[in-house]
From Swiss-Prot:
This is Small ribosomal subunit protein uS9. Keywords: Ribonucleoprotein, Ribosomal protein. Residues 111-130 have a biased composition (Basic residues). It comes from the Bacteria. The gene is rpsI. It comes from Desulforamulus reducens (strain ATCC BAA-1160 / DSM 100696 / MI-1) (Desulfotomaculum reducens). GO terms for biological process: translation. Belongs to the universal ribosomal protein uS9 family. GO terms for molecular function: RNA binding; structural constituent of ribosome. Pfam families: Ribosomal_S9. Residues 108-130 are annotated as: Disordered. One of its GO terms (cellular component) is cytosolic small ribosomal subunit.
Length: 130
Protein backbone atom coordinates (compact mmCIF):
# COMPACT_ATOMS: atom_id res chain seq x y z
CA UNK A 1 0.00 0.00 0.00
CA UNK A 2 1.30 3.45 -0.90
CA UNK A 3 2.00 5.81 1.99
CA UNK A 4 -0.24 8.89 2.23
CA UNK A 5 1.79 12.06 1.76
CA UNK A 6 1.05 15.67 0.94
CA UNK A 7 3.32 18.10 -0.89
CA UNK A 8 3.78 21.87 -0.97
CA UNK A 9 6.34 24.14 -2.62
CA UNK A 10 7.32 27.29 -0.76
CA UNK A 11 9.35 30.26 -1.94
CA UNK A 12 10.87 33.29 -0.19
CA UNK A 13 13.60 35.58 -1.59
CA UNK A 14 15.91 33.17 -3.45
CA UNK A 15 15.03 30.09 -1.38
CA UNK A 16 12.83 27.24 -2.61
CA UNK A 17 11.51 24.61 -0.20
CA UNK A 18 9.89 21.31 -1.12
CA UNK A 19 7.80 20.21 1.85
CA UNK A 20 6.37 16.70 2.34
CA UNK A 21 3.79 15.94 5.04
CA UNK A 22 3.60 12.33 6.20
CA UNK A 23 1.31 11.09 9.00
CA UNK A 24 3.49 10.83 12.11
CA UNK A 25 4.23 12.29 15.52
CA UNK A 26 5.39 15.81 14.68
CA UNK A 27 9.07 15.59 13.72
CA UNK A 28 10.37 18.37 11.45
CA UNK A 29 13.42 17.42 9.36
CA UNK A 30 15.12 19.96 7.06
CA UNK A 31 17.77 18.65 4.63
CA UNK A 32 18.17 15.46 6.73
CA UNK A 33 18.78 17.42 9.95
CA UNK A 34 16.53 18.27 12.88
CA UNK A 35 15.00 21.73 12.30
CA UNK A 36 16.81 23.39 15.24
CA UNK A 37 20.15 21.84 14.21
CA UNK A 38 19.73 23.05 10.62
CA UNK A 39 18.65 26.64 11.27
CA UNK A 40 20.53 27.07 14.56
CA UNK A 41 18.11 29.72 15.88
CA UNK A 42 15.02 29.21 18.01
CA UNK A 43 13.23 32.09 16.22
CA UNK A 44 13.61 30.39 12.82
CA UNK A 45 12.41 27.11 14.35
CA UNK A 46 9.31 28.99 15.56
CA UNK A 47 8.78 30.52 12.09
CA UNK A 48 8.84 27.06 10.49
CA UNK A 49 6.36 25.61 13.02
CA UNK A 50 3.86 28.52 12.87
CA UNK A 51 1.42 26.87 10.41
CA UNK A 52 1.33 23.66 12.49
CA UNK A 53 0.67 25.52 15.74
CA UNK A 54 -1.95 27.79 14.18
CA UNK A 55 -3.92 24.81 12.84
CA UNK A 56 -3.33 22.54 15.88
CA UNK A 57 -1.79 19.80 13.71
CA UNK A 58 1.59 19.63 15.49
CA UNK A 59 1.37 15.95 16.49
CA UNK A 60 -0.43 14.69 13.38
CA UNK A 61 2.29 14.96 10.73
CA UNK A 62 6.00 14.46 10.24
CA UNK A 63 7.43 17.22 8.04
CA UNK A 64 10.23 16.42 5.58
CA UNK A 65 11.81 19.43 3.86
CA UNK A 66 14.36 19.86 1.07
CA UNK A 67 15.36 23.51 0.81
CA UNK A 68 17.89 25.17 -1.52
CA UNK A 69 19.06 28.72 -2.24
CA UNK A 70 19.06 31.93 -0.22
CA UNK A 71 20.08 32.39 3.40
CA UNK A 72 18.69 30.93 6.62
CA UNK A 73 15.89 33.49 7.02
CA UNK A 74 14.70 33.07 3.43
CA UNK A 75 14.86 29.29 3.77
CA UNK A 76 12.79 29.38 6.96
CA UNK A 77 10.20 31.58 5.24
CA UNK A 78 10.12 29.29 2.20
CA UNK A 79 9.65 26.28 4.47
CA UNK A 80 6.74 27.99 6.26
CA UNK A 81 5.12 28.83 2.90
CA UNK A 82 5.51 25.25 1.62
CA UNK A 83 4.27 23.76 4.89
CA UNK A 84 1.13 25.92 4.78
CA UNK A 85 0.45 24.82 1.18
CA UNK A 86 0.94 21.16 2.10
CA UNK A 87 -1.46 21.52 5.06
CA UNK A 88 -4.12 22.93 2.72
CA UNK A 89 -3.61 19.92 0.45
CA UNK A 90 -4.02 17.63 3.47
CA UNK A 91 -7.12 19.44 4.77
CA UNK A 92 -8.79 22.12 2.57
CA UNK A 93 -10.79 23.35 5.62
CA UNK A 94 -7.56 24.90 6.99
CA UNK A 95 -7.28 27.28 4.02
CA UNK A 96 -9.19 30.29 5.49
CA UNK A 97 -7.20 30.15 8.75
CA UNK A 98 -3.83 29.98 6.98
CA UNK A 99 -4.85 32.63 4.43
CA UNK A 100 -5.91 35.04 7.19
CA UNK A 101 -2.53 34.57 8.89
CA UNK A 102 -0.79 35.30 5.57
CA UNK A 103 1.02 31.96 5.33
CA UNK A 104 -0.32 31.12 1.86
CA UNK A 105 0.82 34.41 0.34
CA UNK A 106 4.20 34.45 -1.42
CA UNK A 107 6.21 37.33 0.08
CA UNK A 108 7.08 39.43 -3.00
CA UNK A 109 9.96 41.38 -1.41
CA UNK A 110 13.20 40.67 -3.23
CA UNK A 111 16.73 42.08 -3.06
CA UNK A 112 16.91 45.31 -5.06
CA UNK A 113 19.31 45.24 -8.00
CA UNK A 114 22.55 47.22 -7.96
CA UNK A 115 22.60 50.30 -10.21
CA UNK A 116 25.69 51.48 -12.10
CA UNK A 117 27.32 54.57 -10.63
CA UNK A 118 26.40 53.38 -7.12
CA UNK A 119 28.20 51.06 -4.73
CA UNK A 120 25.10 49.05 -3.78
CA UNK A 121 21.39 49.29 -4.68
CA UNK A 122 21.09 52.78 -3.15
CA UNK A 123 24.45 53.52 -1.51
CA UNK A 124 26.17 56.30 -3.48
CA UNK A 125 29.93 56.86 -3.44
CA UNK A 126 31.10 59.32 -0.82
CA UNK A 127 30.57 62.95 -1.86
CA UNK A 128 33.22 65.60 -1.23
CA UNK A 129 32.38 69.29 -1.54
CA UNK A 130 36.02 70.36 -1.85
Amino acid sequence: MAQVQFYGTGRRKNAVARVYLVPGEGKVVVNNKEVLDYFGRKTLDMVVRQPLELTNTTGRFDVLVKVVGGGVSGQAGATRHGLARALVQADPNLRPVLKRAGFLTRDPRMKERRKYGLKKARRAPQFSKR
